[in-house]
């Protein structure tokens, strides 16, 4: 069991739900992101979702796109985000951390190198919104090589009713339920 599974099991035993936050890494800078992470842990959040800045975040709406763009302008990168993660773990951050990023980032870094860096820096889970279940073979094979690998969080969308049982059967930790079609953070809903 990793930190995500441990936290969720404890919450289930207490009859509580998980409170999961989202923060864009490196916005406005990594020092601020680290402070935000420790403040969230102190406030009692259950799981932190850290968005790895990407130049073309197609599943995200204007707010997260803008945050990602500004973070990149300020020097944020995957390597910098890994370094930040290593520092917060060494400084005592115990909360589960999930990276939300796009598969292009993983692919260009090299899947095996990426997973090894996640393990080395204490990343507990991955949300990869542009990687459908049917195309997860390579990363799943690499993740399966090490019990300390992060959990690959499955996304379940409103149009996938026939796929829901398959996705749930293959899920670990939690599932990311897409509540509406389209990009996140767009409109008044």
Locate the predicted segments by residue.
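Active-site-adjacent beta->alpha loops and helix N-cap segments on the catalytic face
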Residues: 1-11, 54-65, 76-86, 106-113, ...
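N-terminal small/glycine-rich loop or linker at the start of catalytic domains
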Residues: 7-27, 61-67, 88-100
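Active-site mouth loops of central-metabolism enzymes
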Residues: 19-33, 98-110, 151-159, 187-188
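Conserved beta-strand positions in the central sheet of alpha/beta enzyme cores
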Residues: 20, 46-49, 127, 175-176
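Conserved, mostly hydrophobic/aromatic
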Residues: 21, 40, 51, 118, ...
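Catalytic cores of alpha/beta
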Residues: 30-41, 159-170
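Glycine-enriched alpha-helix->loop->beta-strand junction motifs that scaffold or abut catalytic
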Residues: 44, 118-124, 144-152, 170-177
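Active-site rim beta-loop-alpha module in soluble metabolic enzymes
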Residues: 169-189
